[in-house]
Swiss-Prot record:
PANTHER family for this protein: SHIKIMATE KINASE, SHIKIMATE KINASE 1, CHLOROPLASTIC
Biological role: Catalyzes the specific phosphorylation of the 3-hydroxyl group of shikimic acid using ATP as a cosubstrate.
InterPro entries: P-loop_NTPase (IPR027417), Shikimate/glucono_kinase (IPR031322), Shikimate_kinase/TSH1 (IPR000623), Shikimate_kinase_CS (IPR023000)
Protein's recorded name: Shikimate kinase
UniProt cross-references to PROSITE patterns, sorted A to Z: SHIKIMATE_KINASE (PS01128)
Positions of substrate binding: D34, R58, G80, R138
Family designation: Belongs to the shikimate kinase family.
Species, as recorded: Fusobacterium nucleatum subsp. nucleatum (strain ATCC 25586 / DSM 15643 / BCRC 10681 / CIP 101130 / JCM 8532 / KCTC 2640 / LMG 13131 / VPI 4355)
A GO-annotated cellular component: cytosol
Statement: the UniProt record of this protein carries the keyword Nucleotide-binding: yes
Catalytic activity annotation: shikimate + ATP = 3-phosphoshikimate + ADP + H(+)
Length: 172
């Protein structure tokens, strides 16, 4: 059994929400990569993107994932774009049981349509279209990176989701 559980998926798929509850029920530590980045930079993800750019952010994200994945007994919530870097997935595969929270486009849209903290979605007129386009580009990477895929929709029960992940992790 691997030491950690890493949650991957598109922004808004529930990685942080599921991760917090999963860590609590399994008596593990919870690590939100975006929050670690914000603490490191003393700035919001939005501000980092605007002031230093996406390349800087992705480099920092890689560094933080490498550092945090070396810890034991953690549930790690990754950023939605973390799978775009092969090094992130390579490291997570070495140390973590990877779960893809496969949320529907409708679910993602409902969760993200009024959100202003996601730099990629800011100043975008048709958020649903951008979500569809980005998810289409990323979905294969999420799928091939995952040890387990769990489907998420707007009616998914978080407790059932956590129970499924816990059960699969224990028997893995």
């Amino acid at each position: 059994m691997k030491d950690n559980i890493a949650l991957i998926g598109f922004m808004g798929s529930g990685k942080t929400t599921v991760g917090k509850l999963l860590a609590k029920t399994m008596d593990m530590k919870f690590v939100d990569i975006d929050k670690v980045i914000e603490a490191h930079e003393k700035k919001s993800i939005n501000d980092i993107f605007h002031e230093k750019g996406q390349i800087y952010f992705r480099d920092l994200e890689r560094e933080i994932i490498l550092q945090e994945s070396l810890k034991n007994d953690c549930v790690i919530a990754t950023g939605g774009g973390s799978i775009l870097d092969n090094e992130n997935i390579k490291r997570l595969k070495e140390t973590s049981f990877i779960v893809f929270l496969n949320a529907t486009i409708e679910c993602l849209y409902l969760r993200l349509k009024d959100n202003t903290t996601r730099p990629i979605l800011n100043d975008v007129e048709d958020k649903r279209k951008l979500i569809e386009e980005l998810l289409e580009k990323r979905k294969f990477l999420y799928q091939i990176s995952a040890d387990y895929i769990i489907d998420i929709n707007e009616h998914t029960n978080i407790y059932e989701t956590v129970d499924k992940i816990k059960e699969i992790y224990i028997i893995s």
